[in-house]
């Protein structure tokens, strides 16, 4: 499975109205930090690949809106930030040409390349599988 198309990292996005209600918590916090309402949810599938410069660009953008990160970032608790949605929404708004976007409401999902779960839902459902995998190693 290639993670790039035409030299651009593949990023998935799904319209918010199609997202499970448990994940809607990420919309408001993403909107709060970015200052615009993202049309899509971007925490769709691992791995997520971003050019290194986006971290600096996003930091500058956030600090222009909220002040130095060292003053507020450590105070964020619980479900008050989704770094994957911040990165995705920022990339989609300000550097869309640097990615190959897949709108999951219009295109099929690419094949999985890693096993992933949802940590906020707990690990009980995955524990038996992990125990079996670790026992084999």
Stretch-by-stretch model annotation:
Residues 2-75:
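Conserved catalytic core of nucleotide-sugar-dependent glycosyltransferases
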Residues 62-137:
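A glycosyltransferase accessory/donor-loop signature
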